[in-house]
A protein has these predicted regions:
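Alpha-helical scaffold/interaction cores of sigma-54-like transcription cofactors
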Residues: 1-759
């Protein structure tokens, strides 16, 4: 087979046909027919322009009701109000309605709407589609997410900078109040479809997907396929697994293969390319790995196998967040297959799907959303808060606009690290940076959120250390530093303007872009390209970017400083301001829930989610290992988790406010099934272990687990409970034999005068 598995020449095909049929005339006839068929082929392409999924929207009448008749200060707003396109009329009316409801009907906000509408319309015309429909579709599904019982996060990524997204309820932060750059999301220099990311609750995403499919059809929502490739390490392991030679007929030992793969260096989270491992790379200051080369020489041909399979597709999977919404005929642009877990996914990966005309939506998940939902559920159940719908409850208590961020208690808790699972600040790095920088407002928390991800080069002051140093010594230190480096007054003023908020640091993507535009004379498009190179770690393009900065500046002293302050710190992993600020507000929400209500509710919610028990009543499998780890983590924080209580415990963990502890859930107990738990709850209360036993009639394994797990401790001593159960259920012996005597003597169960009686 492999002998013929290549594109043959005319002569090769002719010779094979002649050998096959033994007749030159037949071979010539077949080739002639093939040529005629080839002439009839019609070229076609699967590529087409991307189509924006549409949803039905309210048909607002053509009207100028929002303004006086003579008001023409906003010509595009007026044009949209009278547009023949229902999607355009809906978008502008919903935005203006949002301004009214939020008491933001002001010149500055109307002017921003005019700007954003202009950008959306311009890009839509370039793409030959109504781009306003993209936002209307997103608004429709945001409303659906809330109806399905999921929290929708305050924002994620650059979309937070667009005022219209805020007014439509897609995001929750006023970008004008927080000075978030709208051009970071959409601008005329980048005429492409926007990319809005949404954070949902993991436990609710399946229900959300089903709701969308009910609305759009079984293939109305399909997750995007991914195709994994052989990386440097996996290529080594794969090659070793299949390697055979005369000297090694049984192949290479697994331990040896693991050792060889461990020799592949890693830098800034990326494995070296196999060519860099073997030959080095002067541009990246990489030297050949001698130990790896030595191992390769022991196995002739192994290196050739590794280099030939590096980068080849070796598996398929499901995109973490990407979904595509299809219309009436999904097969117009797509074909489908099943993922390893059985879910239907696209046959194309993301880039090919978009090239075929599909539009991706990103529906991500964060566990903190489940924790907030669980916390609200328990507060509702205990009647601590009113039983409103989830969206109203969220808006009433923890919407970013209702939390008083001037409350010093929030920042004291953040710095102290005494609130469990503060979003983005619960790990060792997050706790350390919160204690080190001690943020006192959302912007400072945003800086801390961004800086914890920046990796500094060896021997270079980290951004966290620089921030803490200048925060302590005063911003004058930053000014003195620039003057010592002989920066012109104009540059000093601009750098103060961009960096003073963060104490002379550049930890935010937009900061770097603004400095490059303002100081290094980059265009918006060039600055955005620089951001992509840095954010996506395109290390091969860094030298080219550095040269561009120096060429633009035409002053090496200033260029050195701009590169050192604005670009080099972000080569690790920088956050966008439009992303970091809403994420900081999620952290604030978690602190607020723990301090505004009894913290036992928040702590219990964290334990439920961390133990994987979010759907404790759904009959799912119990992961005892995960539960044990979650309990260990939470008790190490000084939070008490009590044993199960037969009269109080439910399926999952529950807050015991009276005793300020978390009550263990019975679903986490071995041999205690869902049906039994349901029966236990339905037959309460129980006055004794005997009362329980005859009401529920559990199996032997279940009863022993409940006794050993302490479920009856408030009623009876555990040993007495077990003894009663054995006495009550085991068949009584009418006589004993000599075989029983050793046990009777051992446990002292014979009368004291037994020996005298026998004698």
């Amino acid at each position: 087979f492999y002998e013929f598995a290549h594109l043959m020449t005319y002569d090769e095909v002719y010779d094979l046909l002649e050998k096959c049929f033994g007749d030159r005339m037949i071979a010539e006839y077949i080739l002639e027919n093939s040529r005629k068929l080839g002439e009839k082929f019609t070229f076609y392409s699967l590529e087409r322009k991307q189509m924006i999924p549409k949803v039905e929207v309210k048909d607002y009448p053509k009207s100028w009701k929002w303004f006086s008749e003579g008001n023409c200060r906003y010509p595009l707003i007026r044009e949209l109000c009278f547009s023949d396109n229902i999607q355009e009329r809906y978008w502008i009316n919903e935005c203006l309605l949002g301004l009214k409801e939020k008491n933001l009907y002001k010149t500055e906000y109307l002017a921003r709407i005019e700007i954003e509408a202009d950008v959306i319309k311009y890009i839509g015309e370039k793409l030959d589609d109504c781009l306003f429909a993209y936002f209307n579709t997103f608004k429709h599904y945001i409303d659906l997410f809330w109806e399905c019982g999921s929290i929708v996060g305050p924002g994620r990524g650059s979309a937070t900078g667009f005022l219209s997204n805020y007014l439509l309820g897609i995001t929750q932060l006023d970008p004008i109040r927080w000075n978030l750059p709208y051009w970071r999301f959409l601008n005329k220099e980048r005429a492409e479809l926007p990319d809005i990311d949404i954070d949902l609750a993991p436990s609710k995403r399946p229900a959300i997907f089903e709701a969308i499919r009910r609305e759009r059809g079984p293939l109305g929502l399909v997750q995007v396929a991914t195709f994994g490739t052989e990386g440097t390490k996996s290529a080594v392991l794969t090659a070793c697994r299949g390697y055979r030679s005369d000297d090694y007929p049984d192949g290479i030992d697994v331990d040896v293969a693991q050792y060889m793969s461990s020799l592949i260096p890693q830098e800034r989270g990326f494995l070296w390319d196999i060519n860099d491992v073997i030959y080095g790379n002067e541009e990246k200051d990489r030297k050949p790995v001698t130990a790896f080369i030595r191992e390769m020489k022991q196995y002739p041909g192994l290196l050739e196998i590794i280099t030939s399979i590096c980068g080849l597709v070796n598996k398929r999977g499901i995109h973490a967040s990407g979904v595509i919404l299809y219309g009436e005929d999904p097969f117009e642009t797509a074909s489908f297959m099943k993922a390893p877990n059985g879910d239907i996914i696209t046959c194309y990966d993301l880039h090919k799907a978009e090239a075929a005309g599909d539009t991706k939506y990103d529906f991500l998940v964060t566990e903190v959303s489940d924790k907030i939902i669980k916390c609200f559920d328990m507060l509702h159940e205990d009647k601590v808060i009113q039983n409103d719908n989830l969206r109203d409850t969220y808006n009433k208590y923890i919407h970013p606009e209702v939390i008083d961020t001037n409350d010093p208690a929030i920042w004291e808790h953040l710095a102290a690290g005494d609130v469990l699972d503060v979003f983005q600040f619960s790990g060792g790095v997050g706790l350390a940076i919160a204690k080190k920088l001690k943020p006192k407002n959302p912007l400072e928390m945003t800086a801390a959120n961004a800086m914890m991800r920046l990796m500094s080069e060896k021997g270079v002051e980290s951004q966290q250390d620089r921030y803490a140093r200048i925060q302590k010594q005063g911003i004058e230190v930053f000014d003195y530093e620039m003057r010592q480096r002989h920066m012109p007054e104009e540059i000093i003023e601009k750098m103060h303007n961009h960096c003073d908020t963060y104490y002379g640091c550049c930890a935010i993507q937009e900061q770097m872009m603004e400095i490059l535009m303002d100081v290094a004379h980059f265009t918006l498009g060039e600055a955005n390209n620089a951001r992509k190179i840095v954010a996506k770690k395109q290390m091969s393009k860094i030298p080219e970017l550095r040269k561009q900065v120096y060429d633009k500046m035409q002053n090496d002293i200033i260029a050195d400083y701009v590169w050192e302050i604005a670009v080099r710190p972000q080569l690790g992993y920088a956050f966008s301001m439009n992303h970091s600020l809403p994420y900081s507000f999620v952290g604030i929400q978690t602190i607020y829930l723990a301090m505004h209500f009894n913290p036992i509710y928040w702590n219990t919610a964290c334990l439920i989610v961390n133990s994987g028990a979010t759907d404790e009543e759904a009959g799912g499998q119990t992961d005892y290992g995960k539960i044990a780890k979650a309990i260990g983590d939470i008790t190490s924080s000084g939070i008490k988790v009590s044993l199960a209580n037969i009269n109080k415990s439910g399926f999952g963990f529950a807050p015991d406010v009276e005793n300020n502890q978390i009550l263990f859930g019975m679903k986490g107990m071995l041999n205690v099934g869902d049906d039994v738990i349901t029966a236990i709850i339905e037959n309460r209360p129980y006055s004794s272990i005997k009362d329980f036993y005859y009401k529920v009639k559990p199996s032997k394994q279940t009863m022993i687990s409940l006794i050993k797990g302490g479920a009856f401790d408030e009623m009876e001593d555990r040993k007495f409970a077990m003894a009663w159960y054995i006495w009550e259920t085991c068949e009584k012996k009418s006589r004993i034999t000599l075989q029983n005597m050793p046990s009777l003597i051992k446990y002292g169960m014979l009368p004291e005068d037994t020996e005298e009686r026998i004698m």
